Amino acid sequence: MNTSVIRYLLGYILKLEGFLLLPPCIVAGIYYEKSGIYFLIVALISIAIGFIFSAKKPRDFTFYLKEGCATTALGWIVLSIFGCLPFYISGEIPSFTDALFETISGFTTTGASILPEVESLSYCMNFWRCFTHWIGGMGVLVFLLAIIPLSGGSNINLMRAESPGPSVGKLVPKMRHTARLLYIIYFGLTTMEIIFLLFGKMPLYDAICTSLGTAGTGGFGIKNDSFCSYNVYLQWVVTIFMILFGVNFNAYYLLLFGHIRDALKVEEVRYYFGIIIASVVVISVNIAHMCTGVFDAVTKAAFQVGSIITTTGFSSTDFDRWPELSKTLLVLLMFIGACAGSTGGGIKVSRIVIAVKTIRKELNGYIHPKSVKKLTFEHKPVDHDVIRSINVYFMTYAVIFIVSLLLVSVENYDFTTNFTAVAATFNNIGPGLSLVGPTCNFGFFNNFSKYVLMFDMLAGRLELFPLLILFHPSIWKELFIQADKKVKGNRKEKQNVRM
């Protein structure tokens, strides 16, 4: 295992985080808040440690998928630990576990909060909560790919370890240019949302924080009632942009370069919009008696469907009071999730579509045994390795979900609370139902349950396997053995120099 490049990249992640901790200092300066000093302290510490880690440049930057997964998992853990320190040392979130939970929830774009009073936080702390969504939405390692030159194979292995979905492709020949292009699209859409929100007379601070949360499909709000207090125009703007950020970014690349017909032919996106439209129609009819009219019903249904399927987690109403059909459909959307290659979480539409097509193909095999029709997706045959990887993903997903549900159930809360708490964190949604509904929070869970849910958030964001690799004994053996060899080698070199 190439431990030197893992160390080097972790150093860059810490340096990058140090600079990302500076914008909250600016916010603190604007609002004359003393809390900005804590961000500055953590930023300096993070940058200093980052320089130590990345001081010695590796001779060989080549590494394989296992190094990519290990770097990704360790990077996100380190990112979260340093990211939670401003909350903790400032005393605004006095418990380290709670501060870490809030930060992991932010970076993984989950949006599950332990805070009963969001508005009691300082402006800079609330900005940091929302900014973590934006950082984690596209992925910090994708950003690193845009600024650090690695060999082509290393680039794709690093991106595969962090990017959501069953496969990762290049938009342009060089992966470094792909990463840059993704961030250009990401930044452009975020800026557009801010502008549209300002047109609706939303305050600039609110517009920026809301857009950062929407872009990362995160869901941290700056109001205790999430989005309930905003007008209908603002709700529709956020609804549209939540759905847009749940689209596969490959489609935006095609649109950007004028390939409109090809963009409209993207199969996953067509299924994605089909699911949204069908869900909005069903829920609108189901909640019509609770609304003031058809438009009100469609507005509320569209907002919540867009929020849940994209795993954003904003709420414009207390959907925990909706009829059982609507709540069941929303829970189902939690599992489906957004498109692969988007900032959304969940299982992903592409996996669901391929799984359904696989079942249909097997059924056709029973009816027509001699049929040799191949399974296709996005107008291309699906390789057997892709089908196998999706099957393994579903099995691993089910095992982690069941084990997490059992562990959280030890506290003896009702089944709906436990089930939707795991579903909401594992799929990076945010709110669930019952005690973790849209008007509630996760603060009542004990520390053990919170760490289980933190694991779920990280596992869900990293597509399970990069995090699970850290629990494989051989990984730690390779890391420690190689580190020990390097220490002994350095000692021998020093002894030879003295002689």
Which role does the model predict for each range below?
Residues 1-499:
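Membrane-proximal intracellular helices of multi-pass ion channels
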